[in-house]
Amino acid sequence: AATKQMNALVDEKYINDKDVVNLLENKLVLITGKQTTTEVKDFSDIAKAETIAIGDPEVVPAGQYAKMALTHLGLYDALTSKYSLGGNVTEVLNWVASSSSEVGIVYSTDAKSSKDVKVLAKCDNSLLDEPVIYPVAKLAKTKHSDETEKFMKFIQKKSSLKQFENYGFTVNK
């Protein structure tokens, strides 16, 4: 999920704007470990948690979205002492799964990949400045234009999109 990064590539002329396809959408979710007891039920009462795992907003797109949602709720700055900042979503997921953190914020698809966490709540898109979109594009200058075109067509085929849906993504139409 990196529309900001894709836009930067367009701005730097590495990618032509007309070639960008917003292929998939994901959701941000609040999770806890299956064996963890928590009073937290929703994003709005996340302050009840002792520890909160999120991706580092400086480098992890999921962390940027988590910060956005918590900022919209007026909670981000007030909770800084409770954060464990992960270097990636998998690290956050593992902390929550092992009960090292009481709750965490990850993508829905990541939560779905673990048997050791449960989803407490989905983040309403109104808490985000933009939805969690996965854009794809070919490079403006590539020696492998034919292969790139074939790949772009392949990932947009009905059968490919069905596989993405099986993993919890929503096809962005």
Task: Give the location of each predicted region.
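Exported/periplasmic ABC-transporter solute-binding proteins
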Residues: 2-13, 19-24, 29-173
